[in-house]
């Protein structure tokens, strides 16, 4: 085996272990924020939505800067620094007793994420061959689901004692993740050339096809982020106990572990990437609309199952498509900018979703936020269809297995 192939194989295993750790620790804390501050402390959902939206916007919206800096200086220093900053954010969250302190803790967490997330994504593009990326992204997403369940179970168990214990555990584990990367992550460069920060950003902004694709995905993310805000609140409201939230993530894990990789393998040879993305989005949109009208957990979990199945169909195609469009001369910048749709859609989804949820309760129309999310999903579906029309998009980009 050549040294290059050996480095790629070792890199794959490192990425898988590192991804599992990061996802697990994230889900120890973040799914419980809405339960802690809305249900236990009585805050308005919009206040928590602002905090979650701020974290999302900072982490993803500034990703192009984090990626461009990583293009210049390498992945390792950015990843280690970002993880330590997220640990500081979790520690601050544990003592939050006013909205501004929760917002500040989410700001720190988001800033840490904008430092470590783009270089980690760029390492996947660097180390995984193009024909293997779709399957590798599926493996990462299966890990995401398993990590989400384990993290949510651990967080829910710790919440029985004290939310400060939840946050302290998250902070300590992120410090351990930083030490793991500092010790084992080689000093890899992300791009084929040492790209100046400004040049990497310029390359991305001049790529109109990529920019349009990323911004269109904002509507997709408005739906996707509700697994962190409105869905946990809905499950808690109907079940009457925050312990039921862990079953929501257990459903996601079961579906992902059993369906994600087989669906990706089967569909990659039969359907274009954009068809898989749009089909998943359509299923997610249809499953959102009736959620506000359900009256028991069985009905709610059935719709959540449908939502997760849509995500299982869409996510590998979305990630593979983003990676295939990245310029090898500025991988960090591209993967950083690819998060802008999540920044915009996530911020609007959290803040707007929280506001609509409060409004629906005030007007005794609980279906209001879910109907609006379904409409946004359909509009995004149509926008993607327009963008991916053959007159506008090169055929090579859309071929099965591309």
UniProtKB/Swiss-Prot annotation:
It is found in: Cell inner membrane. One of its GO terms (molecular function) is transmembrane transporter activity. It comes from the Bacteria. One of its GO terms (cellular component) is plasma membrane. CDD domains: MFS_MdtH_MDR_like. It is a multi-pass membrane protein. Its main location: membrane. Residues 34-98, 160-164, 235-243, 298-299, 361-367 are periplasmic. Keywords: Cell inner membrane, Cell membrane, Membrane, Transmembrane, Transmembrane helix, Transport. InterPro entries: MFS (IPR011701), MFS_dom (IPR020846), MFS_trans_sf (IPR036259), MFS_Transporters (IPR050171), Multidrug-R_MdtH (IPR022855). The chain crosses the membrane at residues 13-33, 99-116, 139-159, 165-185, 214-234, 244-264, 277-297, 300-320, 340-360, 368-388. The keyword Transmembrane applies. Coiled coil: none annotated. The keyword Cell cycle does not apply. Residues 1-12, 117-138, 186-213, 265-276, 321-339, 389-402 are cytoplasmic. Belongs to the major facilitator superfamily. DHA1 family. MdtH (TC 2.A.1.2.21) subfamily. NCBIfam families: PRK11646.1 (NF008650). This is Multidrug resistance protein MdtH. It comes from Salmonella choleraesuis (strain SC-B67).
């Amino acid at each position: 085996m050549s040294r290059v192939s050996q480095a790629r194989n070792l890199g794959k295993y490192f990425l898988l272990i590192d991804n599992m750790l990061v996802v697990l620790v994230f889900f120890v804390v973040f799914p419980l924020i809405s339960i802690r501050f809305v249900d236990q402390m009585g805050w308005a959902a919009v206040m928590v939505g602002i905090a979650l939206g701020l974290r999302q916007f900072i982490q993803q919206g500034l990703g192009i800067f984090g990626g461009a800096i990583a293009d210049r200086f390498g992945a390792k220093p950015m990843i280690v620094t970002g993880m330590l900053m997220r640990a500081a954010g979790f520690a601050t969250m544990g003592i939050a007793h006013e909205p501004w302190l929760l917002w500040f803790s989410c700001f720190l967490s988001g800033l840490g994420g904008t430092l470590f997330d783009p270089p980690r994504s760029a390492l996947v593009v660097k180390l995984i061959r193009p024909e293997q990326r779709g399957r590798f992204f599926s493996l990462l997403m299966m890990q995401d689901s398993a990590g989400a369940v384990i993290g949510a179970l651990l967080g829910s168990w710790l919440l029985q004692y004290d939310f400060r214990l939840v946050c302290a555990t998250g902070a300590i584990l992120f410090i351990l993740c930083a030490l793991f990367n500092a010790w084992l992550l080689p000093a890899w460069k992300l791009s084929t050339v040492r790209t100046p920060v400004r040049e990497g950003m310029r390359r991305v902004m001049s790529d109109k096809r990529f920019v349009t694709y990323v911004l269109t995905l904002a509507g997709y993310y408005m739906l996707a982020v509700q697994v962190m805000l409105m869905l946990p609140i809905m499950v808690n409201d109907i079940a009457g106990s925050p312990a039921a939230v862990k079953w929501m993530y257990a459903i996601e894990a079961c579906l992902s572990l059993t369906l994600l990789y087989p669906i990706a393998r089967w569909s990659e040879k039969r359907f274009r990437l954009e068809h898989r993305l749009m089909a998943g989005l359509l299923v997610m949109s249809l499953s959102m609309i009736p959620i506000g009208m359900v009256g028991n957990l069985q009905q709610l979990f059935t719709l959540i199952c449908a939502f997760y199945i849509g995500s299982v169909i869409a996510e590998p195609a979305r990630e593979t498509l983003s990676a295939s469009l990245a310029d090898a001369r500025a991988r960090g910048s591209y993967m950083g900018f690819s998060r802008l749709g999540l920044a915009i859609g996530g911020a609007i989804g959290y803040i707007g979703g929280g506001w609509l949820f409060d409004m629906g309760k005030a007007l005794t129309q609980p279906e209001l936020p879910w109907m609006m999310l379904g409409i946004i999903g359909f509009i995004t579906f149509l926008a993607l269809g327009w963008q991916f029309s053959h007159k506008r998009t090169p055929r090579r980009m859309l071929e099965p297995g591309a």
